[in-house]
From Swiss-Prot:
It comes from Saccharomyces cerevisiae (strain ATCC 204508 / S288c). The modification Phosphothreonine is found at residues 1045, 1157, 1429, 1440. GO terms for biological process: axial cellular bud site selection; cytogamy. Co-assembles with BUD4 at bud sites. BUD4 and BUD3 may cooperate to recognize a spatial landmark (the neck filaments) during mitosis and they subsequently become a landmark for establishing the axial budding pattern in G1. Residues 965-980, 1044-1063, 1342-1351, 1440-1452 have a biased composition (Polar residues). The gene is BUD3. This is Bud site selection protein 3. The keyword Ubl conjugation applies. The modification Phosphoserine is found at residues 766, 1063, 1075, 1134, 1149, 1160, 1228, 1254, 1257, 1390, 1412, 1443, 1501, 1549, 1589, 1614.
Length: 1636
């Protein structure tokens, strides 16, 4: 038996060894070359040390550029140690090509290329080798390959030996970097290593026909294991290995002598950890493990392992393990004193982070799930007496809560202990590390001020700032996005540099950790990985801790555009396959416990998650390769957006059209050999664009056959010119070579510490500091960018020299007069200098006027002292409105070549005319753009930009140090405006800077260039900056470096600057240059640029003057009334509402755009924001003069307001329906907030939600900026019109702000004091109102033609009043108005509701609570402009005011509105909710009287709908209370003042109930007061009055049975009693408080 077992294992081992040989390797070159000897240098998977020892130490590197075929390329030439012959490796857009044993003798068939070398290179064996291989590789290309590779397909390919010889002569030796270092860069870029694919996706397509269902199922059965879930929770929750552990001191002596208090604290810490750990262990042993065993044995019906693991995830095991380790560490450390206790905590507590993070994420819904579990399985769980629901929940939720206790104890230990001086530093370090780790679980020191750089999680929560330059593509779709993985990665060229790899379900993001060395210290302190912290922030929706380093997004790509290949066990290469935007990134995982294959597997899983159609999932593996198969129905597959390049079609006829339609590289067509499927033979047709096969296999081997075929086709698809993605592959390699070239350019000018400091100072606002503080950003909600883009940290005083039109500083370059070069030489040996000339020659028409303009500007001084222009207006984005004032810059391709500075050719000869200091300055300034190690595997500066920058444009941070870039030593400020028109556009300059190829001083004979250039280009100047003799123009070079550095702070090149930041810079410039308002507004974006909820709650001020001043600064004179629709005297004031919904984003009213900040420091920025929003509508109707007038005369403006301060308009307006809102500029707003708008409560914390000023109709009928409207006044308006507007607005304000009118009995109108609310908003409003009333004139009631409508001022005593209630049902009957019996209404009635909200009640609450069981149309309730419905009598329409809950805007004249003083207020605010009736009661100077409360009660409990008292409605769900019929009611009085006794609830035998009558009863609106009238035959209506007596009320109460008195308020009134009860307001009697 033992022999059998051992043989079995040995066979299995041999089989595994065979399987390890199976892998899928990608090609290093898109054109495979077969070596002459059959063995390639790449056959062996060499390590970096092998390459360095055998190749790089004996090699030289050359750099060249070919415009015809190869593009930019590098050549490595070395001598083979075996054959003593020259070998060569070429790196270019084809990949890596190796040429061994190159024959450079005269017998070589490629010797003609050597003959065409320049005379100086004829003796160089290296140049001979390069010439031979350049000619040798050309015949290896087929015509089809050549057509794809040619840079310019329109030109004829004249590639011959002379061309190859000239191209070899033009190659330059690279001496800036040692060959070993340069070889390492190629190695770490993945150009020399073998790349493997570990997993891929196969789409399986089937037709849903009954005839093929069974056959399809049989075929799918052999595709591998079917998975129920993509991520296996057991493997995902695998424990984290502890790399560090606490060890006791070796000398076994205490390091600290502790007193009794400190010892007690340490023992308390040990006791807490002991108890908690024992509880966890006991829970696992006695409950969870026992339950798992029973479930595995299938002893519990209905409970599977999957369900159990979902409720009790394996993370609890991991948490228990970490707590056990911590307990062991504490037990070991306590005998050695308090310092060792801190050390043990500092080492062990960081392991809590990952375990607790995953545990919290896995138990989010535990409270709900455990209730369901206990309900169904309480009788089968072990020890159910001990482990109750509360006990289990406390154990599962305990770990997070215990952390706070640990923190408190450790803080007490730190404060109570007096540390020895030698231990003070170590103790502080350990203590800080412990606190930082615990705080990393989620601590928000300050409220979130703004939302511009936040990320919305799936549940709608807002995270703190994640990273600078957050991609625009990731600002929305968070409801669907999932976080798949976050990993720390290391830069291969700099081990101290850390990056982050974030894998979402739809995007892969590469993030730089700025100043990572400050976090990952080498002192042995154990800290959580930043990847774990970010994962916790994303998964558990907690803010990032304040002490992690700043993050900056470097790259990102869509999940379906990325190709992942494995370089070794811990290194991966990510290639984005997207044309010109392609790039390549190499990442090495920092953790040794995570394999590269597992990360590559997650990329495949993320692609599966991104699929948007239904599928079945299968998994098959062979060796280290995993195949995921997703089975789609044919119709669903047609609409699928995530499609693999490989597909399997079941029982579908083969067709190559399917390849074209679905963009497939490979298609399998499988079917059984016989129709009945009895035999297991499967016919497999394999189709590609270039070949097809016909294979017959058994059904068991179908998946292995597919994998074998994929092993052949995957390298062709992803690394060959035969692929449909050949252009993308070429672009990846081309951009990779450009990136290496850019790195070498930076290395050639190494940055000294001094220039590093300068560069750091320049980018100080751009780069994050180590304190991750929360700052306010003034950007838009649709932009995820850093707060530094708003120039919040820029010195305010440095903008004094900023020109008005400046948006971006561009480098200024001297222009040289170029001479013509022969065409054939340009073709064959075009260098970067000739490229620059070629760019100049494209625009000969604009070049002549150039010197004339410059001569006028500079005169003769320009020859010797060229004055650089400081700034150039940036090209206006295509999506911005065209400026009528300034002419926009043309596109980059056609930009003008004019420059502001010209260097005469004579300057070229003055190589020694500078002082030593100036020469050093020129040199150092060229090195201002330092080489950063984080760019070694990064992107080239101009990748994907080219001539179409808008395709790649996203909002990013641009930081300018205005103090630095405004330095202008040689040009006065007065020349700024004259130079602005003569500045070279950004495109030409960035193009030239990026084409630098002079990496070293290379010997090039003059014979290779027939004509000597008369002038050198800037690139040549920069390329030879290290040679002082070749540096020219001491005045221009420092500025050139300055502006170049400023432009490259946040990106690697000036070409990476994004045009979308111009509005941010413009807004910052407005703070200092307010007089430039109109010029700035011409270029301002039309996107909403304000805080999303800026005006949600009106801001309050310390005094009225501050309110007026801050408001007056927002809107210049003469602008506000033009926005208002003011017509004749009888026209209601309203906003213009006939605009389309989309116009709201472009025509914002001043009311909707102003934002009043709470402090004066923020007022300036907010002021400019208000202007920006306003300017969008005002356009250029207002000049700078008007703006300046407003700014220079704020005092007069304030005085104007003071004179008419009674104008406090509350402007009614018609809000468009929410369904018509379409914010075309902000798709993320629609996705994130359109469904959320009804749940944002204005009584939330003020820092959470702010009213969006520009979106008037976020909530139907809600007024905007009621309190601030006093500041929106047109000073230039004539006095008569202003006075008229004052009178109208006062009346309208009263009507809008009136609550449901209620009146106290006259007996209560005494002189008792008025007790005001303590609410600050209410006090301010009350104060303002009193002053407004004091300034009223005798014309207060102008327009009110009804003398009975006069409103006497009646002082009212304090009383309770209902200021807010839940909604009630809209009824169909009306009642007489009690106010017809009153002489007037109180004058101060407008402040009787909602002390928190000074404009209107919150209608969003009504949207949520409105019980729409009667199917009442929304337009009846929310559309104020609609005509009254038939339920309301026509004769009462004039007396119907505009409801408080509905903002109306009708055509009634002001006189008509004021004449309706005696109005029947439909109490739509006193509304009942179905389940919970809510109300607010305030104690103010006016009160709701009993009779009006009775009206509200009658309306609430009215059973009639649309006037039909007998309408049958559904039965109420609450208990029934029976009331006596009206006929048995006694009446004490007759006639108008007749009163009746209230019915008493009685018990009725069920046998006496008329069930037919029950079925016809009306529905009760409130379930807690459902009543059933037994007989309701009396339909008489009783009029009511405000008169009554206390005696009548007292007699009525005394006649009742005391035993039923407590039920009185809970019994709803019947119809007749409702009517008669309205007289209940007895004069002089005590007011009875009623609740609804």
């Amino acid at each position: 038996m033992e022999k059998d077992l051992s043989s079995l294992y040995s066979e299995k081992k041999d089989k595994e060894n065979d399987e390890t040989l199976f892998n899928i390797k990608l090609s290093k070159s898109v054109v495979e070359t077969t070596p002459l000897n059959g063995h390639s240098l790449f056959d062996d998977d060499k390590s970096l040390s092998d390459w360095t020892d055998n190749v790089f130490t004996q090699s030289v590197f050359y750099h060249g550029s070919d415009d015809l075929i190869w593009g930019k390329f590098f050549v490595c030439v070395y001598k083979s140690p075996n054959s003593n012959k020259l070998n060569a490796i070429i790196f270019d857009k084809l990949g890596t090509s190796c040429f061994e044993s190159v024959d450079i003798s005269s017998n070589s068939q490629y010797y003609p290329a050597i003959e065409n070398l320049s005379p100086s290179d004829q003796e160089s064996n290296v140049k001979k080798c390069i010439a031979v291989i350049l000619l040798q590789r050309y015949p290896l290309l087929s015509p089809s390959d050549l057509s794809q590779i040619l840079s310019n397909k329109s030109e004829n390919c004249d590639y011959d030996p002379p061309y190859a010889g000239d191209l070899a002569s033009s190659c330059q030796l690279i001496t800036a970097v040692p060959p070993e270092d340069l070889g390492k860069r190629f190695f770490t870029s993945g150009l020399l290593q073998n790349r493997f694919v570990s997993s891929t996706l196969l789409d399986v397509i089937y037709e849903n026909n009954e005839s093929t269902i069974e056959l399809n199922n049989r075929l799918v059965f052999h595709l591998g294991e079917q998975l129920e879930q993509l991520f296996n929770p057991v493997t995902e929750y695998s424990p984290e290995q502890t790399e560090y552990g606490y060890k006791a001191p070796e000398d076994e002596l205490p390091t600290e002598s502790d007193d009794d208090l400190v010892k007690a604290i340490c023992n308390e810490l040990l006791q807490l950890q002991t108890n908690f750990t024992f509880n966890l262990v006991e829970f696992l042993q006695k409950f969870l493990i026992a339950l798992r065993v029973r479930v595995l044995n299938e002893e519990i019906n209905g409970l599977s392992t999957t369900k159990l693991n979902r409720l009790f995830p394996p993370t609890i095991d991991e948490v228990t393990r970490i707590n056990c380790i911590f307990l062991d560490s504490l037990k070991t450390a306590i005998p050695y004193g308090s310092l060792e206790v801190l050390k043990a905590c500092s080492i062990t507590i960081p392991y809590f982070y990952k375990a607790y993070t995953r545990h919290e994420a896995a138990t989010k819904n535990f409270s709900k799930d455990i209730k369901l579990f206990i309900r169904h399985f309480s009788n089968v769980i072990p020890e159910r007496e001990v482990y109750t629901e509360m006990k289990i929940e406390s154990i599962i939720k305990g770990p997070q809560e215990k952390l706070l206790k640990l923190k408190l104890i450790i803080e007490r230990l730190w404060k109570s202990k007096k540390w020895r001086p030698k231990n003070q530093e170590m103790a502080k370090k350990c203590y800080n590390n412990i606190i930082d780790v615990i705080d990393s679980f989620g601590k928000l020191d300050s409220p979130l001020h703004s939302y511009s750089t936040r990320v919305f999680t799936p549940s709608g929560k807002i995270l703190t700032e994640l990273a600078k330059c957050w991609p625009v593509e990731l600002q929305y779709k968070w409801l669907k996005r999932r976080v798949v993985g976050v990993y720390d990665v290391v830069d291969l060229n700099d081990e101290n540099k850390r990056n982050l790899l974030v894998i979402f379900s739809d995007y892969v993001v590469f993030i730089n950790i700025l100043e990572a060395e400050s976090y990952y210290t080498s002192d042995g302190s154990n800290r959580p990985l930043i990847s774990d912290i970010l994962m916790n922030s994303l998964i558990n929706e907690v803010p990032l801790p304040s002490k992690i380093p700043k993050l900056k997004v470097e790259r990102h790509c869509y999940i379906d555009e990325v190709l992942v290949s494995i370089l070794d066990k811990s290194t991966l290469r990510f290639d984005r396959l997207k044309g010109k935007d392609s790039f390549s990134m190499v990442c090495k995982l920092s953790s040794a416990f995570i394999s590269s294959s597992s990360v590559a597997d997650l990329i495949t899983k993320a692609r599966i998650l991104e699929k948007d159609t239904a599928f079945h999932l299968f998994k098959a593996s062979r060796s280290h390769f995993t195949l995921y198969s997703t089975a789609h129905e044919l119709c669903a597959y047609d609409s699928e957006k995530i499609k693999s390049k490989f597909a399997l079609f079941l029982n579908i006829p083969p067709s190559k059209e399917i390849l074209e339609v679905n963009n497939l590289h490979l298609a399998f067509f499988a079917r059984f050999c016989s129709n009945d499927g009895r035999d297991n033979i499967v016919i497999l047709d394999v189709l590609t664009k270039h070949d097809d096969k016909h294979i017959e296999v058994t059904s068991d081997n179908i998946v292995f056959t597919i994998i074998n075929q994929l092993a052949i086709e995957i390298p062709i698809c992803f690394s060959s010119l035969n692929s449909s993605m050949a252009k993308d592959l070429l672009c990846v390699n081309e951009n990779l070579i450009k990136n290496l070239e850019h790195q070498l350019e930076e290395v050639k000018h190494p940055s000294t510490d001094e220039h590093r400091a300068v560069n750091s100072k320049l980018s100080g606002a751009s780069d994050f500091d180590a304190t991750h503080e929360k700052k306010r950003s003034y950007g838009t909600i649709t932009t995820f960018r850093s707060y530094t883009s708003d120039l919040k940290d820029s010195p305010s005083g440095d903008n004094s020299n900023v020109t008005k039109e400046t948006k971006e500083i561009l480098p200024v370059k001297p222009t040289k007069k170029s001479s013509k070069k022969p065409r054939e030489i340009q073709k064959k040996t075009k260098t970067n200098a000739s490229k620059a000339e070629h760019i100049e020659k494209k625009k000969p028409n604009k070049g002549k006027g150039f010197f004339g303009v410059l001569k006028n500007v500079f005169g003769s001084k320009s020859k010797s002292k060229p004055s650089p222009v400081q700034r150039v207006p940036k090209k206006i984005s295509q999506r911005h409105p065209k400026s009528p004032v300034k002419k926009p810059m043309t596109s980059e391709k056609k930009s003008s070549p004019k420059r502001a500075v010209v260097s005469s050719p004579k300057i070229k000869k003055k190589s020694t005319s500078f002082s030593t200091k100036e020469s050093q300055t020129a040199k150092s300034s060229l090195r201002a753009v330092e080489f950063k190690s984080d760019d070694l595997i990064g992107k080239p500066p101009d990748v994907g930009n080219g001539a179409h920058p808008q395709e790649n444009t996203r909002i990013s941070s641009v930081v300018r140090d205005t103090k630095y870039v405004s330095y202008n030593p040689s040009q006065p400020v007065t020349e700024n405006t004259s130079n602005e028109k003569n500045v070279e556009p950004k495109a030409d300059q960035s193009t030239k800077q990026d084409n630098i190829s002079n990496f070293a001083d290379v010997e090039v004979s003059a014979s290779s260039y027939p004509e000597k250039l008369d002038a050198e280009t800037d690139d040549q100047i920069i390329g030879k900056a290290t040679n002082s003799s070749s540096v020219h123009g001491n005045k221009e070079l420092p500025d050139l470096a300055e502006v170049t550095t400023a432009n490259r702070v946040s990106t690697t090149s000036a070409g990476d600057q994004r045009i979308d930041t111009q509005s941010e810079f413009l807004r910052a410039a407005d703070v200092e240059n307010l007089s430039d308002d109109d010029e700035h507004r011409q270029n301002e974006s039309r996107v909403f640029n304000d805080d999303l909820f800026g005006d949600f709650i009106p801001k309050h001020y310390r005094n009225k003057q501050e309110n007026i001043n801050s408001s007056s600064n927002l809107f210049p004179e003469g602008k506000v009334p033009q926005e208002k629709g003011v017509s004749n005297e009888n026209t209601n004031i309203s906003l213009k509402t006939n605009e389309d919904a989309s116009t709201l984003t472009q025509k914002l009213s001043p009311q909707a755009s102003k934002v009043l900040t709470e402090n004066s420091n923020e007022l300036k920025d907010t002021n400019n924001e208000g202007k920006d929003a306003k300017d969008i509508k005002l356009g250029d109707d207002y000049s700078d003069k008007e703006t300046a007038k407003e700014i220079t005369k704020p005092k007069n403006f304030v005085e104007g307001i003071t004179e008419r301060k009674e104008i406090f308009p509350t402007i009614p307006r018609l809000a468009p329906p929410a369904s018509k809102i379409n914010f075309q500029r902000s798709p993320s707003y629609i996705e994130l907030f359109q469904g959320m708008r009804v749940v944002l409560d204005k009584h939330d914390a003020h820092y959470n939600w702010k009213r969006l000023a520009s979106q008037v109709s976020l909530s139907e009928g809600l007024k905007v900026n009621t309190e601030e409207d006093a500041a929106i006044i047109n000073k230039s308006q004539d006095d008569a019109k202003a006075e008229r507007m004052t009178q109208i607005s006062e009346v309208i304000e009263y009507e809008m702000q009136q609550p449901i009118p209620t009146y106290l009995p006259k007996a209560h109108l005494d002189d008792s004091g008025i007790e005001k609310s303590d609410d600050k908003f209410f006090e301010i409003e009350e104060e303002l109102k009193e002053e407004l009333k004091g300034s009223k004139t005798g014309n207060e009631d102008v327009g009110n033609n009804n003398p009975s409508n006069s409103i006497p001022k009646i002082e009212k005593p304090p009383a309770f009043k209902v200021i807010r209630t839940s909604p009630v049902r809209i009824i169909g009957r009306t009642f007489e108005d009690t106010r017809k019996y009153e002489n007037g209404s109180p004058s101060d009635i407008s402040f009787t509701y909602d002390t928190h909200n000074n404009d209107e009640p919150d209608k969003r609450l009504m949207e949520l609570k409105f019980p729409s069981q009667d199917e009442i149309p929304d337009d009846r309730f929310y559309t104020p402009a609609e005509e009254p419905t038939a339920e309301f009598p026509v004769e009462e329409l004039p007396n119907t005011p505009r409801s408080i809950n509905v903002t109306t805007s009708n055509n009634k004249s002001t006189d008509d509105k004021l004449s309706s003083g005696n109005i029947d207020q439909k109490p739509t605010e006193l509304l009942d909710d179905l389940e919970f009736s809510s109300f607010n009661i305030a104690f103010g100077n006016t009160s709701m009287s009993t009779d009006n409360m009775k009206i509200s009660s009658d309306l609430s409990s009215n059973k009639t709908v649309l006037g039909n008292a007998q309408k049958v409605q559904e039965s109420p769900s609450g208990p029934l209370i029976y009331v006596l019929p009206q006929s048995s009611t006694k009446h004490e009085k007759e006639g108008f003042l007749r009163k009746k006794q209230k019915d008493e609830p009685i018990w009725v035998s069920p046998s006496k109930i008329d069930f037919a009558d029950l079925s016809r009863r009306t529905k009760a609106l409130t379930p807690e007061r459902n009543t059933v009238p037994l007989k309701n035959n009396d339909s008489r209506k009783y009029k009511y009055t405000g008169e009554g007596s206390i005696g009548n009320m007292t007699n009525m109460l005394l006649t009742k049975d005391a035993s039923y008195a407590y039920l009185k308020d809970f019994v709803a009134l019947s119809d007749d009693e409702d009517e008669d009860g309205k007289q209940n307001c007895a004069v002089g009697g005590p007011e009875k408080l009623k609740f609804y």
